[in-house]
Amino acid sequence: MEYRNSLMWKELNEAPAVIADLAAKNACVMEKLAKEVKGKQIDNIYTAARGTSDHAMIYFKYLAETLLGLPVASGAPSVVTMYGAKMKFQNTLVVACSQSGKAADVMEIVRAANECGGVTVAITNDENSPLAKLAQFHLCCFAGEEKSVAATKTFSCQLYLALMLAEALRGGKVCPSLGEALKNAVAAIDAATDPVAKAFLPAEECFLLSRGVSSAIAFECGLKLQETCYIRARAYHSSDFYHGPMAMIGEGTKVILFASKNSLTPETDAVHREDSLKCAEKMTELGADLYIVTDDADAFAKTGAKIVCVPGADSEKLTVFFFALAVQMLACKVSCGKGLKPDSPRALKKVTITK
């Protein structure tokens, strides 16, 4: 299949237009939710999600902890569904994320939080889903039906709703022109991902690295390469990778590093860049076949890595949206180039329900 004929390609390209209208469509609910959270003196956040949705919650965790100073726990629904734990969700905002809104284990977390006085919000792509109805508040992706098994536009929408939520809780606003900026960047990202897609056609394994906000994209890239390309892809926070997994790097091992030009604040830009450079230099020193997805090509020009230069923004919290498109395009191209079907990977269904 030619990748441009796939549903995955069609749907990932719909994300910019959907994002452009997302803030207005969720503004009323977001205002009420922010008021409720402040009124109940919420002092911690708990997220419940699986797969791609959980990667969107990694993004939210970094935003909430850095911008709001609120600790965010990435929940393990099995604690409730398999062990029967009675969680104390008082003074807790529970954010449940599921594209279909049918995740049974995630719903059990919301039910438990509702029963003991927590504030619950669901992020789904279906206003009439069980999860949307169970939570006290619902933020909708409004992405339309997503037919490809691999989630693309819904992931971008989840990221945007996570950003909206973090900004609403601190009294800030989201970038109103992000959708238009993404639309204008599609052609450049398409061209930038061509060389790396060709290089990954024979790949059977690879590692995806990043640190901080962009880690969400590294983990999503790993999942996309696993499910659509059948590549044994493993994602790590680069700081964790040094503690053992780095021993797997040998001559020619494929590694993708995600590194944005700007951090969340100008004060941390230099530290962020230095950390990414350190990681890049270490990977090339070990002989890795390193690709760096970045909006800061000049900073990595001397690392010896292959640069995948994509457009970015003035903050890492926005640049991740451009990285997300790059990851989705890469996976779609590699899958089709391998003669696979990205829209219907083997052994998978569009809706996965775990309990």
Question: Could you say what each language-model-derived stretch is?
Answer:
Residues 3-42, 137-141, 145-256, 338-355:
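Active-site phosphate/pyrophosphate-binding segments
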Residues 1, 19, 59-62:
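Tryptophan-centered motif/residue detector
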Residues 312-355:
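Peripheral docking tails and interdomain loops at the edges
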Residues 10-13, 129, 324:
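Alpha-helix N-cap/helix-start motif at coil-to-helix transitions, marked by capping-box chemistry
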